[in-house]
Regions:
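Compositionally biased, proline/threonine/alanine/serine-rich low-complexity intrinsically disordered stretches
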Residues: 16, 23-48, 173, 213-215, ...
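N-terminal Sec/ER secretory leader and immediately downstream segment
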Residues: 27-146, 282
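Extracytoplasmic/secreted proteins, especially bacterial periplasmic and envelope-associated proteins
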Residues: 43, 47, 97, 101, ...
């Protein structure tokens, strides 16, 4: 049984800018040349998560998840889910649980290099950084609408046909942040977690070994990569359309700094933890639904 690819749209960071936060000022030298106040790493990381507007990002991801739950029902057990399945999906995509999982993983990752946090906040704690963040969230929410997603895809096709140099910049941004590879890896991890959940729920006639599940998931790599690219560039074109080339180049430059790379890796790792857990729970719940059991 080959499951439909689960393209979990992990946050496209550095496609997570930060709003201005008082912590950015706290890390600068004190007036008169004195030492700046010491801020505990845990406090810094918590402030960074709030500055990144993770709650708003998770709210959009929850909406994406509810839509995906409906698609999963149509694929695996058409017209047999109903309100009960919708309620289960809503619990699995519980925003508070998602946030707790994100925070735990994010703190562990960023905590390895707390000295980088000030640089992250310095870059994004500006009017431009706030604007970038708002554009990213608005674009992600807009793409919940299929017509908006289709329009964004057509725009990218037109940019490609015209050899628009802006598309080159978007590709440079994606490469600087390794967005294709990290999203593909995250999606495959989520697919494997879904498989494991299905196996735990006894969805298969015969037990599958870990090797069999890994092989089946890896066979989806090409499809997942194609879907990632088909979603990523329309998203980037929509989100960064209002930005000047100069602003986008500065964003790319920051992405290549040690702080930018650290943040990128930490955010992907944190959302990978979130979506692996969600996918496992979805797989187990889907297996029980397919068998007509109480979830």
């Amino acid at each position: 049984m080959v499951l439909p690819p689960i393209l979990t749209r992990l946050v496209l960071v550095l496609s997570m800018a930060f709003a201005a936060h008082p912590l950015a000022a706290q890390t600068r030298p004190a007036p008169g040349g004195g030492e700046p106040p010491v801020v505990a790493p845990g406090v810094q990381i918590a402030a960074l998560g709030e500055a990144m507007r993770i709650a708003d990002v998770i709210a959009v991801m929850r909406e994406e998840g509810l839509q995906y739950g409906s698609s999963l029902e149509a694929e695996l057990f058409p017209d047999r889910g109903g309100p009960r399945w919708q309620a289960v999906v809503g619990l699995i995509y519980d925003a508070d649980t998602m946030r707790k999982r994100f925070d735990a993983a994010f703190e562990a990752e960023v905590g390895r290099d707390p000295g980088a946090i000030a640089g992250m906040l310095d870059f994004f704690g500006s009017e431009r950084g706030q604007r970038i963040l708002q554009l990213e969230i608005e674009a992600r929410r807009a793409l919940l609408d299929e017509s908006a997603e289709e329009a964004a895809k057509i725009k990218v096709e037109d940019m490609s046909a015209r050899n628009d140099p802006r598309l080159d910049l978007l590709q440079e941004f994606a490469e600087a942040n390794d967005l294709i590879e990290l999203n593909v890896a995250g999606a495959l991890n989520s697919n494997l977690a879904f498989y494991r959940g299905m196996a735990e729920g006894a969805a298969f006639d015969e037990a599958l070994s870990e090797e069999q599940m890994l092989a089946d998931v890896w066979s989806q790599e090409g499809d997942v990569r194609r879907e990632t690219e088909e979603w990523l560039y329309p998203y980037l074109a929509l989100a960064y359309g209002p930005l000047s080339d100069s602003d986008l180049r500065d964003y790319i430059a920051f992405s290549r700094t040690p702080e930018g790379r650290r943040l990128n890796g930490a955010t992907f790792a944190a959302f990978d933890a979130v979506f692996s857990a969600i996918s496992h729970d979805l797989g187990r719940a889907a297996a029980k639904q397919m068998q007509g059991e109480d979830i």
